[in-house]
């Protein structure tokens, strides 16, 4: 099992998502899947982000159609690092 580590920015963005009515149960469900390294269901549309120096090994998935989780698995140290969460426009200014 991977230890879950939340980036400071993630914590702030997650509080904002909850205030907007996003479900903590949905976040907990996907964190359980990721931390236990289970197969991620297709509905989450998990994919790698552009592989630049800043985003090396960073992935994104859709908790809901416009609620995203950006994360990185650091298997050598057994960590699931939650980097960002929010809408497309929150995260990518779209």
What are these regions (language model features)?
Residues 1, 9-12, 19-24, 59-68, ...:
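Enriched for short, Lys/Arg-rich terminal
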Residues 12, 29-32:
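Generic recognition of well-ordered alpha-helical segments
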């Amino acid at each position: 099992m991977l230890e879950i580590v939340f980036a400071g920015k993630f914590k702030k963005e997650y509080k904002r998502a909850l205030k907007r009515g996003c479900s903590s149960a949905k976040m907990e469900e996907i964190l359980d899947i990721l931390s236990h390294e289970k197969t991620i269901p297709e509905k989450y549309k998990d994919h790698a982000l552009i592989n630049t120096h800043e985003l090396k090994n960073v992935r994104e998935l859709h908790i809901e159609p416009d609620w995203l989780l950006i994360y990185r698995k650091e298997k050598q140290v057994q960590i699931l690092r939650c980097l960002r969460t929010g809408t497309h426009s929150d995260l990518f200014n779209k």
